[in-house]
Amino acid sequence: MSQKIYFKITNDKECHNGFQYKDGLNILQEKFNDNLEDSCVPGRLYFTKPKHILKYLDYGIYLREIYLPTDNPDFKMIRDPTGDKYGANMIILGERRDLRNPDTWKYMVSKGVDIRAEDDYAVKWASKNGHLKVVEYLVSLGADIKSDGDYAVRWASENGHIDVVKYLVSQNADIRADNDYAVKWASSNGHLEVVKYLVSQGANIREQNDYAIRLASQYGHLEVVKYLISLGADIRADNDCAVRLASENGHIEIVNYLISQGADIRAKK
């Protein structure tokens, strides 16, 4: 067995493309795909070097150590044309670590992972998924929460992770980045607590022609709609777009409420 360590990210069931991974030796049952021009195809068990692992964060929640059974005469391996991963017909899965745990990230750093790689994707990923302790650890190592137009706080808001949002704001994240993206998409997903907090921090609910209330109406979030109206949102913006979207999506309670507030159901696009 090779002592060189590689990494792989697995989901909660550790099943990818119909292959159920297990601790120890994993052997591909189908024919190995050794076509040098093929990428991301069946017929390979994929893994990567530590320096590339952050490209694959969205594949799951576990970090697996990967070793290669190079002493097995049937072992086959190919470098993917993308250049940042490999495929083999058999791999050995070592220890499993949870990416939601800061200790996993400490381990990754010890193996040479650059937490700022991929335009600071690690802190954006942790923010998007609500892993506050991981966010805090990454920031302590110099992660830039303002990378990519303050995408970390935008994603945390969009997904309703209020504790992460508050922490990022304490680190000077700009909640108004990208035309108040944060409050618009928190409204879209019905995260009332986040919407209220963002407003308390200066978010503009009327940005982009009252887009927040239009999104809240479209996706059926009555309490958000009521809150936005209480702050002066214009329910008739863009030719009564809010009531039209609520109607198109079958949100009768919102339709009735908007009508009670003066929406014109006969307005045209």
From Swiss-Prot:
Keywords: ANK repeat, Repeat. Pfam families: Ank_2 (PF12796). ANK repeats lie at residues 118-147, 148-177, 179-207, 208-237, 238-267. The keyword Repeat applies. The keyword S-adenosyl-L-methionine does not apply. SUPFAM superfamilies: Ankyrin repeat. PROSITE patterns: ANK_REP_REGION, ANK_REPEAT. This is Putative ankyrin repeat protein L23. It comes from Acanthamoeba polyphaga mimivirus (APMV).
